[in-house]
Amino acid sequence: MESEADYVLALKGNHKHLAEDVKDAFTGRSKEFAYNTLEKDHGRVEERTYTALCSQEVLDESQCDAWKNLSSLIQVDRLVTLSDGTERHEKQYYLSRLPAEGVEKISSYIRGHWGIENRLHWHLDVTFREDHCRARKEYAATNLNTIRKLALAIVSQ
């Protein structure tokens, strides 16, 4: 984080203690900012609630200092309802330099990232038939995925 750019980073299991603290923060009574979206597409309805908290109000100083200019914690609560009535519910957590008050802007960054990821995976599957790959031994699947991404980057230039 050398530059002064804004960031929105997905919080995953590789930061176990921080992930637990962030998750716990959303069960408290801190001041929160929320933004809701509803999308109907491809035979499903997706409801998303983006909730942001000021990081300094819920994390200790050492946790905040570990992330340059950390300003907010974000929870995305996503409920997907399929046309047959089946529901899938998931929560994801993010760290951001953007202020919690800007939760709508933060949501657009998160959705934009999902769009890029979806297009990448679509290309890997359709162009390279990655889902049909039977490589399972040791690091073969990971190595082939890296080669496909490299090939896609070269072709896309």
Residue ranges, per PLM feature:
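Conserved PLP-enzyme active-site core in the AAT-like
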Residues: 1
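An anionic, glycine-rich sequence signature occurring as long contiguous blocks
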Residues: 5-111
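Basic, amphipathic alpha-helical segments enriched in Lys/Arg and hydrophobic/aromatic residues
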Residues: 108-157
